[in-house]
């Protein structure tokens, strides 16, 4: 599991510039969790000055665009993202839908894949495109070993561009559909690192997040 702290890059030119772990922060989208009110600029600046690594929960659309940041002063212990991911795994909170278009132009939404076991592999860019090829091949072998592989949908969501993927990714007879420019989706799910594999069951519930693909037992989640 990941343990992410979401900070901010900069509130805006007229407030301050600060470094962040993840993304640029639009100060006009930051709200108090308890009241639902927008946080005034001076209060927001004070919050960030007191805690430069402030954790902000995000409300996003299906493509990962941030609609709203939510600040909860009672959830600043460094495990805010882990709590959210754990709530997806426990089933207390539904795993959020996503909408992507593959590099081959196929439009896909998670909610349309009910009844399928879904594998989502998050990958980065640059050298990782070639370096992690053996890991993808291991996952492909696991899928091909199933007697009911048609019950599986598999995706790789890269942070790389489509051109970079087409130039550097060479997968032969792969079960995976490839998605480019996926940084926003990684941030949507509070994933602060790549080379992670998410497994989602037939009801759309997150089973787990895996760093080690050898621990993934697809057959345990499929009918015989």
Please place each PLM-identified region on the residue numbering:
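Mid-chain, structured segments of secreted extracytoplasmic proteins
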Residues: 49-89
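Short active-site neighborhood of thiol/selenol oxidoreductases, capturing the structured segment around
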Residues: 91-93, 106-139
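Thiol-/selenol-based redox modules, centered on thioredoxin-like
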Residues: 79-81, 199-224
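Short, internal strand/loop/helix patches
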Residues: 155, 163-203
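Structural micro-motif
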Residues: 25-29, 42-45, 53-55, 174-176, ...
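N-terminal "domain-start" segment that seeds a small globular fold
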Residues: 30, 36, 72-108
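Short acidic-hydrophobic, aromatic-tinged amphipathic segments that line or gate anion-handling sites
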Residues: 101, 177-181, 210-211
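Bacterial Sec-dependent N-terminal signal peptides
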Residues: 1-8
């Amino acid at each position: 599991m990941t343990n992410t702290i979401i900070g901010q890059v900069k509130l805006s030119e007229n407030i301050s510039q600060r470094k962040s772990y993840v993304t640029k922060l639009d100060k006009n989208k930051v709200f108090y969790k308890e009241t639902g009110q927008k946080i005034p600029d001076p209060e927001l600046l004070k919050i960030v000055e007191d805690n430069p690594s402030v954790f902000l929960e995000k409300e996003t659309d299906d493509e990962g665009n941030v609609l709203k940041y939510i600040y909860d002063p009672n959830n600043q212990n460094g495990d805010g993202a882990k709590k959210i991911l754990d709530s997806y795994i426990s089933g207390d909170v539904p795993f959020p839908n996503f909408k992507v278009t593959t590099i081959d132009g196929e439009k896909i939404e998670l909610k349309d894949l009910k009844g399928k076991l879904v594998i989502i592999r998050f990958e980065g860019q640059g050298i990782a495109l070639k370096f992690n090829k053996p890991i993808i091949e291991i996952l492909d072998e696991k899928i091909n070993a199933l007697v009911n592989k048609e019950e599986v949908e598999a995706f790789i969501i890269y942070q790389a561009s489509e051109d970079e993927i087409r130039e550097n990714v060479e997968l032969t007879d792969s079960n995976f559909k490839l998605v480019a420019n996926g940084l926003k989706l990684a941030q949507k799910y509070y994933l602060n690192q790549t080379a992670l594999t998410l497994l989602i069951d037939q009801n759309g519930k997150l089973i787990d997040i895996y760093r080690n693909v050898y621990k993934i037992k697809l057959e345990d989640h499929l009918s015989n």
